[in-house]
Amino acid sequence: MKEVKAIHKYAKTSAFKVRLVANQIRLKSVDEALNILSFSNKKAAVLIKKVLNSAISNAEHNDGLDIDELFVASICIDEGSTMKRIRPRAKGKANRILKRTSHITVGVSK
């Protein structure tokens, strides 16, 4: 069956943190996945929920699939670019702060 995808690039959270939430909804039905994401307290849950809703809308509008039969066929979290920032420290030194980003790809199928 055809897989319908939605992608969110350069999400401002690390891939490790997003994967913690993504592993909970992999291969679940869409209704169950949305329920899990609704009750999660993590920022990544909000990001994944937006991408999942977009994938559901794509499946319904573009391919005419029935929402009740959909499940999360694939969810892929890749590392995005890393922004490097400087934090001043004592005695004229500086530490590097890494602002990590991630790419969230959600695929739904029948």
Curated annotation (Swiss-Prot):
GO molecular function (one): structural constituent of ribosome
Alphabetical GO biological process terms: translation
GO cellular component assignments: cytosolic large ribosomal subunit
A Pfam family per the record: Ribosomal_L22
CDD domains with a match to the protein in the record: Ribosomal_L22
Domain of life assignment: Bacteria
Spans traversing the lipid bilayer: none
Keywords: Ribonucleoprotein, Ribosomal protein, RNA-binding, rRNA-binding
Assembly and binders: Part of the 50S ribosomal subunit.
Family in the record: Belongs to the universal ribosomal protein uL22 family.
Known function: This protein binds specifically to 23S rRNA; its binding is stimulated by other ribosomal proteins, e.g. L4, L17, and L20. It is important during the early stages of 50S assembly. It makes multiple contacts with different domains of the 23S rRNA in the assembled 50S subunit and ribosome. The globular domain of the protein is located near the polypeptide exit tunnel on the outside of the subunit, while an extended beta-hairpin is found that lines the wall of the exit tunnel in the center of the 70S ribosome.
Descriptive protein name: Large ribosomal subunit protein uL22
Gene: rplV
